[in-house]
Amino acid sequence: MASVTITSVHEPTNPLAVAHTGEREVEGDQLIKTDTNNDNDIINTLLNNFLYPQELKHNVFVPRFQQRITIVKAWDILSLSTSPPNGTNGANGTNSAPHRPKDLHILDIGCGQGESAVTMAALLQPHMHGARLHITGIDTARPDYGTPYTVAETHAHLTASALGRHISFRREDAAAFFSPSRLSSPSPPGSWPSAANVDAVTLCHSLWYFPTPQSVADLFTTLAGARVPRVYLAEYSFRGSLPGGQQDAHILAARAQALLHASVLEKLSADSSQQNHQGREPRPRAPNVRAALDVGSIVEAAAAAGWAVRRQGTFVPAADMIEGHLEARLVVKDAFAEAVRAEGLSPEREHEVLGLVPGVKKAFARLAAAGVAKGRAMDVWWAELER
């Protein structure tokens, strides 16, 4: 089970919020250590609704969905639907009549193949009690992107599944989704859900894939302009809390990939014939990690657009989450060095990127010497933002 640390000035209020196992006061905020409940039934539901290769079920998709369950529970999005209206609990402490949940429209930005969207549908819908739930996933990836199943194939499978009535997908970015024409147009009866009635935006392991720090800053500005009430984030933190450097390989490999991406963009920006490089599709050799802002940079970009952290926390991914290990293995392969050299970077930049590779190899060597076969994924940071 994943241990979750939450720093918050607001108590979770819904049945999906992770269960408390102990707490202490820290500088006026509340630090709550929590453990996930048994989520096997939810995972089975997700697997029954998702399109994936059976041979990757236990090694990839079970831990991937478990991580998203942990994130969605920590986010506590359901409180937006189930919290009673202001003033229903009087000063004398008496409770009002049971509050009927309100409709909930969530925009999942950078939804990929839909893992986070379907996880929210499976977790939230049983608690809506007659209110409507819809998750709109948006992504700019090509429909034929992905293997062995493409984005188009997984989206079609999801929308035709038992949870599909709560999910839809669009190929566009946040600026297009929240275009002035959509926001300014009157919402006729029956238009729910629409861009004008988004209750929350989620970014689940998607900010790292934005091309530049400026594109992340622009996103927060767009969300502020659209008057989105809440934004929920989850991203790797570039930090590891496990002893013995178990997460070092993932951290260093991610830095190497991010530096490669930044170096390529720097080179392209200097080439007048490539002025529109930021809008193009990723290169076939492009690393999975792109801008990869750290936590402080994400919070700073959000704050510049008027967003403040309402709640935040961290957790260590489960031991069977191998995606960090796979990212690190990619960097130590000869193919990564060959790809770096093929980019035609300046000698200084090439040396800087490749100079991070020995550190990843040393991290693996230390683990091997300790009898550890695989590196662990770095800590995940999540947050709830408000304006």
UniProtKB/Swiss-Prot annotation:
Alphabetically ordered keywords of this record: Methyltransferase, S-adenosyl-L-methionine, Transferase
Pathway of this protein? Mycotoxin biosynthesis
Asked if the keyword DNA repair belongs to this entry, the reply reads no
Q: What Gene Ontology terms describe what this protein does at the molecular function level?
A: methyltransferase activity
The UniProt disruption phenotype note reads: Does not produce N-methylated compounds phomopsin A and N,N-dimethyl phomopsin A, but accumulates N-desmethyl phomopsin A.
- The annotated region (Methyltransferase domain) lies at 98-223
Q: Which GO terms describe its biological process?
A: methylation
Q: Does the keyword Flavoprotein apply?
A: no
- The EC number(s) this enzyme carries: 2.1.1.-
The UniProt function text for this chain reads: Methyltransferase; part of the gene cluster that mediates the biosynthesis of the phomopsins, a group of hexapeptide mycotoxins which infects lupins and causes lupinosis disease in livestock. Within the pathway, phomM acts as an S-adenosylmethionine-dependent alpha-N-methyltransferase that catalyzes two successive N-methylation reactions, converting N-desmethyl-phomopsin A to phomopsin A and phomopsin A further to an N,N-dimethylated congener called phomopsin E.
What does the sequence similarity comment in the record state about its family? Answer: Belongs to the class I-like SAM-binding methyltransferase superfamily. Erg6/SMT family.
Q: What is this protein called?
A: Methyltransferase phomM
Gene (UniProt): phomM
